[in-house]
Amino acid sequence: MSTAEKVQPRLKQRYRSEIREALNKQFSYGNVMQIPTVVKVVVNMGVGDAARDAKLINGAVSDLALITGQKPEVRKARKSIAQFKLREGMPIGVRVTLRDDRMWEFLDRLTSIALPRIRDFRGLSPKQFDGVGNYTFGLAEQSVFHEIDVDKIDRVRGMDINVVTSATTDDEGRALLRALGFPFKEN
């Protein structure tokens, strides 16, 4: 086995060298373990039309695998809903939970490449925090990620991205994500 060191993601290095110290100064924590960090990122793609055509879920699985670098979990309906022609156990979405290095690399690609590619992008809403520092937002189409070949898209799919932090308040979470490069709108 070689003694080569594993390359740390760029955003993770920046967090450890600059951002943690800045957050500690801003909020003056008594313990370094109180400094907020990103715990995980959950990327969810709902495919409601898969209830009528089961092949649609395969396109969502391949798109999400390309975007995140990890095989997504197919989510199935928990109960039947007759109005939607949905039966219990039918696949209706895909989800990926990213942690550690894959999470940091995804956040880096999201903030530096994907979000700037959105047409007429004015920034993320600072009001979508959940009260304890976690942030959730949606993207209208998967083509903003450079891993997706626009010519091979079978249909436009949006996705929900949930950034879970160890922050205890929205202000701490907002400061952490702003320092990581999330472009929030100014009120």
UniProtKB/Swiss-Prot annotation:
Keywords: Ribonucleoprotein, Ribosomal protein, RNA-binding, rRNA-binding, tRNA-binding
GO BP terms: translation
Disulfide partners: none
Any one Gene Ontology cellular component term annotated for this protein: ribosome
Sample GO molecular function, one term: rRNA binding
Alphabetical list of Gene3D superfamilies matching this protein: 3.30.1440.10
Family indicated by similarity: Belongs to the universal ribosomal protein uL5 family.
Function: This is one of the proteins that bind and probably mediate the attachment of the 5S RNA into the large ribosomal subunit, where it forms part of the central protuberance. In the 70S ribosome it contacts protein S13 of the 30S subunit (bridge B1b), connecting the 2 subunits; this bridge is implicated in subunit movement. Contacts the P site tRNA; the 5S rRNA and some of its associated proteins might help stabilize positioning of ribosome-bound tRNAs.
NCBIfam families given in the database record: PRK00010.1
Quaternary structure (record): Part of the 50S ribosomal subunit; part of the 5S rRNA/L5/L18/L25 subcomplex. Contacts the 5S rRNA and the P site tRNA. Forms a bridge to the 30S subunit in the 70S ribosome.
Protein name: Large ribosomal subunit protein uL5
Lineage of the species this protein comes from: Bacteria, Bacillati, Actinomycetota, Actinomycetes, Mycobacteriales
